[in-house]
Amino acid sequence: MIDYVGVCNTVDWSKLILDIADQLPAEIGPKHKAGDPLPGLNQVTDMWAKAGYKTPDLGGTVSWDMFFPGVNFDQSVADKFAEYVGLKDINSCWISRIWPGYFAPIHWDVNDNEIELANQPDKLRWHCHIGKPEFGHVFIADDKCLYNQPQGATYQWSSRKLWHAGTNCGLTPKYILNIW
């Protein structure tokens, strides 16, 4: 389940985007490939293979950039947002960027530490639309399709493992902050 929280304006989202726009991302997704030994990964990669999804190196358009606090932007951004949503301990935080013409098909975010996480209670997750509303910036989580969201629009997820997808059929990069 996904619920609207409100508009977070404790961070200057436009300035943050300007700060990372010309940086190389810390990672380019999808990071994990079929056969990597992570619980839950094959569920995602098998589905993608069956549907014919491909990454750019194989002639496809499944790709997104990932920016991390302490690497690409100041940790205070994650801390301020965590305070806004009431998250006491940050497990993971990143900003995803999807370029025009690219997308992230249906998936849940399989984590490098999935084996350890399997022994812990599930965690809530939040995302924030940090870019201004733009034509073609679409985000789908659970049963909600989010489009033309105001800058700072924040949603809480009932699980970090919620199925979601994003696409950019617009003309400018699409940015979303994720945290759990």
Predicted regions and their residues:
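Non-heme Fe(II)/2-oxoglutarate
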Residues: 1-89
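Short, conserved beta-strand element in jelly-roll/cupin
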Residues: 97-99, 116-136
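A short beta-loop-beta micro-motif enriched in histidine and acidic residues
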Residues: 89-90, 106-125
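A short glycine-rich, His/Asp/Glu-containing loop-to-beta-strand
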Residues: 83-108
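Catalytic core of Fe(II)/2-oxoglutarate
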Residues: 133-180
